[in-house]
Structures are given as structure tokens and as C-alpha cells.
């Protein structure tokens, strides 16, 4: 049965409140939690209507593992993902770990700072504004090549623990849907565990 996603919020204030809400705080988070959550994400993505559904890569890692993350769950939802999805996962994860918020919230904050520009112009300018705001160095000459401010990277937070303990990333859907499918699935998952 097709279950469409509601639109993701674009308001940084609303997004900040959502990310600090008890509805997305895990009571604990282990490899078993990641496995069960990852399968729930896969099922949710496969339930999307064809207008929203695309092959996607789901990756869940424990935070703070440098230089490489400790990936505790990863899978493609269906045939059709490509190696570039892995790059997007890496960059979205880096954004969440550095700033402690979702990659979608980072994008919306940068866009809010470009308020004087019209919608289409703001979207064109967002990557450059991000690089300038945080004085990011680009190893390949491209804008923000270590980070991605596109929806889909989401922090794992645990009740009673300060900071981010892990990162959930979806890559392959439209960026707002990458974000929204994680938020919706985490809320349902945490609600079932409460």
C-alpha cells in the first residue's frame, strides 16, 4: 500500500524544535537498534508512492569514529543505487557530526540567511554561502566537498546523553524526502519503544 510522505518543514525554528523533541530521542541506541531501525526505514521507503520512491542507500553509524565511521547498518532499498550515493552519505554524515543537527536543518539555516534573494536565486547561492559562512576549505576545488547540506542526514540522540551518538543517512530520494522519511520513521520507532 502506498503511503506518501508529508512535506518536510522548511522553517529552521520548527526543524530545530523537531530535532530536540522527545519524540526523536532514543532511550538507548545499539547495533540491534540500528538494525531494526534500518529495516523499518527500508520498509517505509518501499511503501512510498512511485512519485516519491527511488532507489536509496540507508546508512546508520555510531558517531565520533574518526577517520572512518563505525557503520552498524547499511543497505540499498532496491536495485538502482550508485557509488555516488555512498559519497552523499559520507558528506551528509560529516555535516551532522560537525554541527550536531540534520543536514536539512543546516541547509534551511543557510537559506534563511540569504533572505533578500528570490527563491530560485537563493537555491543557486546556498552552497557558496555555506562555504563562505564556515570558511570551508575545498580539497577538490568544488564547493563544500567534505560536507553536504542536502536533506537526509539526521542525528541520533539518546535520552540523558549530551551530543550526537550516531547518524542516520538516507541518500537517493529527493532531498526533502530523504529528510522526512528519516524523521517520520524515527518518530514511529521511538514511539513504539516508549
Predicted regions and their residues:
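Ordered alpha/beta subdomains of enzyme catalytic regions
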Residues: 22-24, 94, 173
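Intrinsically disordered, low-complexity terminal regulatory regions
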Residues: 1-83
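A generic signature of intrinsically disordered, low-complexity regions enriched in glycine/proline
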Residues: 15, 88-89, 182
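Long, compositionally biased interface segments
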Residues: 192-194
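Structured interaction and signal-relay segments at domain junctions
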Residues: 46-137
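Extended hydrophobic
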Residues: 129-190
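Sparse, context-dependent recognition of short Cys/His-centered cofactor- or disulfide-binding micro-motifs
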Residues: 26, 43, 84, 89-90, ...
Amino acid at each position: 500500500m502506498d503511503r506518501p510522505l508529508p512535506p518536510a518543514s522548511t522553517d529552521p525554528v520548527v526543524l530545530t524544535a523537531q530535532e530536540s523533541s522527545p519524540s526523536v530521542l532514543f532511550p538507548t541506541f545499539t547495533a540491534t537498534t540500528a538494525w531494526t531501525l534500518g529495516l523499518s526505514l527500508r520498509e517505509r521507503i518501499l511503501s512510498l508512492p512511485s512519485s516519491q520512491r527511488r532507489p536509496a542507500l540507508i546508512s546508520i553509524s555510531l558517531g565520533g569514529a574518526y577517520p572512518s565511521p563505525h557503520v552498524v547498518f547499511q543497505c540499498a532499498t532496491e536495485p538502482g543505487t550508485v557509488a555516488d550515493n555512498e559519497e552523499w552519505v559520507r558528506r551528509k554524515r560529516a555535516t551532522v557530526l560537525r554541527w550536531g543537527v540534520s543536514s536539512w536543518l543546516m541547509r534551511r539555516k543557510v537559506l534563511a540567511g540569504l533572505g533578500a534573494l528570490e527563491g530560485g536565486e537563493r537555491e543557486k547561492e546556498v552552497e557558496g554561502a555555506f562555504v563562505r559562512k564556515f570558511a570551508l576549505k575545498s580539497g577538490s576545488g568544488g564547493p563544500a566537498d567534505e560536507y553536504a547540506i542536502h536533506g537526509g542526514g539526521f542525528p541520533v540522540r539518546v535520552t540523558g546523553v549530551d551530543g550526537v551518538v550516531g547518524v542516520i543517512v538516507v541518500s537517493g530520494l529527493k532531498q526533502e524526502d530523504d529528510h522526512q522519511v528519516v524523521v517520520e520513521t524515527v518518530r514511529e520507532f521511538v514511539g513504539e519503544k516508549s
